[in-house]
Amino acid sequence: MDFYRALSDYYDEIFPLKGPQKTFLQDYIRRESLTSVLDIGCGTGTFAIETSNTGVRVLGVDLSEEMVEISNKKAKKIGSTASFSLADMRDLSRINEEFDGVFCLGNTLAHVSGDIELKEVLTQFGKKGTHLLLQTVNYDRILAKQVKELPMIKTAHLTFYRHYTFRPDGLLDFNMKIEFMDSREVVSGTNLLYPIKVDRLKKTLLETGWEVSGQWGNFDKDAWTEESPATVLAARRIPR
C-alpha cells in the first residue's frame, strides 16, 4: 500500500476533529465576521467542512489528489456547501476569487523550502484574503529540545509513528510510519520540513503586509510559550 494513499484513507481516524478546534474556529469566524474562507492544505476537508457549517462559503485546496477526492466525497455525503480543488500553496494563481479569510492549518506552512519561499507564500496569502489563521507545530520547542519523536497515535486499526531527523542544512526529515493492527502491514513516508520559529514567522508576516492580531499555544487558546505543542497565529492584512 502506498504511504500517502494509506494516510489519506485513515487521516480522519488519525486526526479527528476535536472540541477545542471546533470552538476555536467558530469563535474566530464570529469575531472577525468572516463570510468566506480559503482553506489551504485542507487535507481531508475537516476544517473546511466544519467552517462551512457556520454558514461561511469555503473553498478548500490541497496538493494531494487523494485528499481532495476524499474531501469532495465527505462534503457530498453530508450535504456540506464546502467545495474542494487541487492547488499548491506555492502557486495560487488559478484561484481567481478573493476571500475574507485564509486558513493554513495542520502544519501545512512548514512544507515551504525556506525563508524565501515562506515570504513568497505569505505574500500570495495576502492577495487572497484580509484575515489569516496559521497553525504549525511549535518548532521553537522542537529545535530547543532537539525533539526527535512525537507521541505515537494509536487507534482501533493502526499505530501512527512520527520521528524527526535533524539535517545539516537546518531542515527536518519528518519520518512517518503506519502499522496496521490486523495485517501487521507497515507503510512509511518522509516529508522535508522547514522548522519555522515563531519570531521568524512573525517577522515575515510583517514584511509581507500582515499584522499579528493573536498568538496561542494550542486551540484551547492557552498563551504561547516555548513549551507549547503548537504555534497558532492570527493576522490581519495591513491596509495599503
Regions found by a protein language model. Give the residues of each.
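Conserved class I S-adenosyl-L-methionine
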Residues: 1-32, 34-43
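Class I SAM-dependent methyltransferase SAM/SAH-binding core
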Residues: 45-91
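Short conserved loop adjoining the S-adenosyl-L-methionine
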Residues: 91-97
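A short SAM/SAH-binding and catalytic strip from SAM-dependent methyltransferases
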Residues: 100-116
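A short glycine-rich, Lys/Arg-flanked "PGG" loop and its adjoining helix->strand segment in the class I
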Residues: 117-131
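SAM-dependent methyltransferase
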Residues: 133-204
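C-terminal lobe and adjacent flexible extensions of AdoMet/dcAdoMet transferase-like proteins
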Residues: 200-240
